[in-house]
Amino acid sequence: MGPFCLGCSHRKCYSPIRNLISQETFKFHFKNLGYAKGRKDTFLCYEVTRKDCDSPVSLHHGVFKNKGNIHAEVCFLYWFHDKVLKVLSPREEFKITWYMSWSPCFECAEQIVRFLATHHYLSLDIFSSRLYNVQDPETQQNLCRLVQEGAQVAAMDLYEFKKCWKKFVTMVAGDSGLGKRLLTNFRYQDSKLQEILRRMDPLSEEEFYSQFYNQRVKHLCYYHRMKPYLCYQLEQFNGQAPLKGCLLSEKGKQHAEILFLDKIRSMELSQVTITCYLTWSPCPNCAWRLAAFKRDRPDLILHIYTSRLYFHWKRPFQKGLCSLWQSGILVDVMDLPQFTDCWTNFVNPKRPFWPWKGLEIISRRTQRRLRRIKESWGLQDLVNDFGNLQLGPPMS
């Protein structure tokens, strides 16, 4: 499913339980334990502010609790649609801050991602006391997608606990209520979250220079350390911000191209343009899987740039490349503009890319090699036709 307005899809309106919660409730449900037995309810303390001449103006604050199987964050989205978006101008800019007892589950995170994708004028900060089911790969993936959609996702530290306590907890003189081991538990929760988010981080500069290096290496041991990376950027025709990601094939597991296909299928998108940067061109199996995926989605535009050709002298690998061209996938060799774009989008946009010696010479040499493969299989005219297609939204 594509992005949608969650509130428009549901008529039932949820309301905050109150503006404040008791100290006992906060101490029990917001305690940032590594193992939190008996804490099945989800609590969400929220504040909504609006920009007014560049100064934030507080509009609403309160507390949500789950309603049966409907988690607190989804209750908030329904309420926000009915009580804020329907009343105020849809063009106003809002900042939403959440303090949550549990981080979103993968289903709620998916709905939050889609809500943010529909409402570009919203900014969302999510501070969680504890991480929910983060061993689950789908949960990890959707937490990363929240960040990619522009949300700030963080564990509650002492500063955030104090802010939440001061604004949302009924006060009793002389009782700080924050308890012992808060900082120790925060470091535990934060380390787990950062480990998850690092997996979606752009490549390090060192990794980029070593893995996307397009020249022949002298030492075989170094050659085998070159890993199959796939960096992708997905652009939709509805004006939404591009989605980016970087995938790595792990030894003995699925190749990065298959991981990429699984990810794109889960989004159920159409009429998109996807640009991929690969360290190695696809193997025959991955090439055929990519070709089948493209044939099933004629509106999708997929352009693959590769730094190096993988076993290009073997006919099965050449045939795999041919299947990509025949399906309408554009396959090219990375040159200086592509290396620069990959660096900017996936490594470090604040620092310039410094090309290594001989980059463009080797790129042209690899391009000639790829062109000879096209010609030997009689595909040059077909590839030229695909290359002349307009890359953009369908004409109305």
UniProtKB/Swiss-Prot annotation:
The keyword Translocase does not apply. InterPro entries: APOBEC/CMP_deaminase_Zn-bd, APOBEC_Cyt_Deaminase, CMP_dCMP_dom, Cytidine_deaminase-like. It catalyses: a 2'-deoxycytidine in single-stranded DNA + H2O + H(+) = a 2'-deoxyuridine in single-stranded DNA + NH4(+). Gene3D superfamilies: Cytidine Deaminase, domain 2 (3.40.140.10). Keywords: Antiviral defense, Cytoplasm, Hydrolase, Immunity, Innate immunity, Metal-binding, Repeat, Zinc. Disulfide bonds: none annotated. The active site is at E73 (proton donor). GO terms for biological process: cytidine to uridine editing; defense response to virus; DNA cytosine deamination; innate immune response; negative regulation of single stranded viral RNA replication via double stranded DNA intermediate; transposable element silencing. The keyword Repeat applies. GO terms for molecular function: cytidine deaminase activity; RNA binding; zinc ion binding. CDD domains: cytidine_deaminase (cd01283). One of its GO terms (cellular component) is P-body. Its main location: cytoplasm. It is found in: Cytoplasm. Zn(2+) binds at H71, C105, C108, H255, C283, C286. Signal peptide: none annotated. Its EC number is 3.5.4.38. The CMP/dCMP deaminase domain 1 confers deoxycytidine deaminase activity, whereas the CMP/dCMP deaminase domain 2 mediates RNA-dependent oligomerization and virion incorporation. DNA deaminase (cytidine deaminase) which acts as an inhibitor of retrovirus replication and retrotransposon mobility via deaminase-dependent and -independent mechanisms. Selectively targets single-stranded DNA and does not deaminate double-stranded DNA or single- or double-stranded RNA. Homodimer. Probable human APOBEC3G ortholog. Belongs to the cytidine and deoxycytidylate deaminase family. This is DNA dC->dU-editing enzyme APOBEC3. It comes from Cricetulus longicaudatus. The gene is APOBEC3.
